[in-house]
UniProtKB/Swiss-Prot annotation:
The keyword Disulfide bond does not apply. It comes from Mus musculus (Mouse). This is Ig heavy chain V region HPCG14. This chain was isolated from a myeloma protein that binds phosphorylcholine. PANTHER family: IMMUNOGLOBULIN HEAVY CHAIN. The keyword Transmembrane does not apply.
Length: 123
Protein backbone atom coordinates (compact mmCIF):
# COMPACT_ATOMS: atom_id res chain seq x y z
CA UNK A 1 0.00 0.00 0.00
CA UNK A 2 1.32 3.41 -0.96
CA UNK A 3 1.28 5.86 1.95
CA UNK A 4 2.28 9.48 2.49
CA UNK A 5 2.20 10.88 6.03
CA UNK A 6 2.96 14.55 6.69
CA UNK A 7 4.07 15.97 10.04
CA UNK A 8 5.76 19.03 11.49
CA UNK A 9 3.03 21.62 11.24
CA UNK A 10 2.09 23.94 14.06
CA UNK A 11 1.79 27.53 15.20
CA UNK A 12 4.73 29.81 14.43
CA UNK A 13 5.27 33.55 14.66
CA UNK A 14 5.82 35.66 11.53
CA UNK A 15 9.46 35.47 10.51
CA UNK A 16 9.86 32.03 12.05
CA UNK A 17 10.76 28.67 10.55
CA UNK A 18 9.29 25.19 10.39
CA UNK A 19 10.34 21.95 8.75
CA UNK A 20 7.64 19.69 7.41
CA UNK A 21 8.22 15.99 6.80
CA UNK A 22 6.47 13.54 4.51
CA UNK A 23 7.18 9.92 5.35
CA UNK A 24 6.56 7.66 2.37
CA UNK A 25 6.18 3.92 1.97
CA UNK A 26 4.98 1.32 -0.50
CA UNK A 27 6.80 2.55 -3.61
CA UNK A 28 10.28 3.29 -4.94
CA UNK A 29 10.77 6.81 -3.59
CA UNK A 30 13.72 7.63 -5.81
CA UNK A 31 11.78 6.90 -9.00
CA UNK A 32 9.08 9.53 -8.56
CA UNK A 33 8.75 13.27 -8.64
CA UNK A 34 7.37 14.49 -5.30
CA UNK A 35 5.42 17.68 -4.73
CA UNK A 36 4.31 20.02 -1.97
CA UNK A 37 0.91 21.67 -2.31
CA UNK A 38 -0.96 23.87 0.14
CA UNK A 39 -4.50 25.09 0.71
CA UNK A 40 -4.93 28.37 2.57
CA UNK A 41 -8.21 28.81 4.48
CA UNK A 42 -11.05 29.45 2.05
CA UNK A 43 -8.78 29.34 -0.98
CA UNK A 44 -7.84 26.96 -3.75
CA UNK A 45 -5.01 24.46 -3.72
CA UNK A 46 -1.65 26.01 -4.60
CA UNK A 47 1.37 24.07 -5.85
CA UNK A 48 4.50 25.34 -4.11
CA UNK A 49 7.46 22.99 -4.61
CA UNK A 50 8.72 19.97 -6.53
CA UNK A 51 11.54 17.50 -6.07
CA UNK A 52 12.30 15.66 -9.28
CA UNK A 53 13.35 12.02 -9.30
CA UNK A 54 16.79 10.41 -9.22
CA UNK A 55 16.95 10.31 -13.02
CA UNK A 56 16.70 14.10 -12.88
CA UNK A 57 19.22 14.46 -10.04
CA UNK A 58 16.53 15.37 -7.50
CA UNK A 59 16.49 18.90 -8.85
CA UNK A 60 13.93 21.28 -7.37
CA UNK A 61 11.43 23.88 -8.51
CA UNK A 62 9.40 26.45 -6.57
CA UNK A 63 6.42 28.73 -7.01
CA UNK A 64 7.12 32.45 -7.04
CA UNK A 65 5.30 32.83 -3.71
CA UNK A 66 7.84 30.72 -1.79
CA UNK A 67 11.03 30.85 -3.87
CA UNK A 68 14.02 31.85 -1.76
CA UNK A 69 12.18 31.08 1.50
CA UNK A 70 11.16 27.43 1.17
CA UNK A 71 13.48 24.54 0.33
CA UNK A 72 12.55 20.97 -0.53
CA UNK A 73 14.89 18.04 0.08
CA UNK A 74 14.88 14.26 0.43
CA UNK A 75 16.33 11.65 2.72
CA UNK A 76 16.52 8.81 0.23
CA UNK A 77 17.73 6.31 2.84
CA UNK A 78 14.52 6.76 4.85
CA UNK A 79 12.19 7.74 1.97
CA UNK A 80 11.28 11.07 3.57
CA UNK A 81 10.49 14.31 1.77
CA UNK A 82 11.12 17.57 3.62
CA UNK A 83 9.99 21.15 3.25
CA UNK A 84 12.10 23.70 5.10
CA UNK A 85 10.07 26.88 5.48
CA UNK A 86 11.82 30.10 6.49
CA UNK A 87 10.74 33.73 6.89
CA UNK A 88 7.17 32.61 7.33
CA UNK A 89 4.35 35.07 6.68
CA UNK A 90 0.70 35.18 7.66
CA UNK A 91 -0.20 34.29 4.09
CA UNK A 92 1.68 30.99 4.46
CA UNK A 93 -1.05 29.78 6.81
CA UNK A 94 -2.50 26.68 5.16
CA UNK A 95 -2.85 22.94 5.19
CA UNK A 96 0.27 21.51 3.55
CA UNK A 97 0.14 18.30 1.56
CA UNK A 98 2.78 16.16 -0.07
CA UNK A 99 1.83 14.28 -3.21
CA UNK A 100 3.35 11.76 -5.56
CA UNK A 101 3.61 12.91 -9.16
CA UNK A 102 3.14 10.43 -12.01
CA UNK A 103 3.21 10.94 -15.73
CA UNK A 104 2.41 9.11 -18.92
CA UNK A 105 3.33 10.72 -22.20
CA UNK A 106 2.67 14.41 -21.75
CA UNK A 107 0.15 14.04 -18.91
CA UNK A 108 1.13 14.66 -15.29
CA UNK A 109 -1.03 14.26 -12.23
CA UNK A 110 -0.76 13.70 -8.49
CA UNK A 111 -2.02 10.20 -7.79
CA UNK A 112 -1.37 9.81 -4.06
CA UNK A 113 -1.78 12.45 -1.37
CA UNK A 114 -1.15 12.60 2.34
CA UNK A 115 -3.76 13.78 4.85
CA UNK A 116 -1.95 17.09 5.32
CA UNK A 117 -0.43 19.03 8.20
CA UNK A 118 -1.63 22.47 9.31
CA UNK A 119 0.67 25.48 9.53
CA UNK A 120 -0.57 28.64 11.23
CA UNK A 121 1.55 31.78 11.10
CA UNK A 122 0.35 34.26 13.68
CA UNK A 123 1.65 36.44 16.48
Amino acid sequence: EVKLVESGGGLVQPGGSLRLSCATSGFTFSAFYMEWVRQPPGKRLEWIAASRNKANDYTTEYSASVKGRFFVSRDTSQSILYLQMNALRAEDTAIYYCARDVYYGYDYWFDVWGAGTTVTVSS
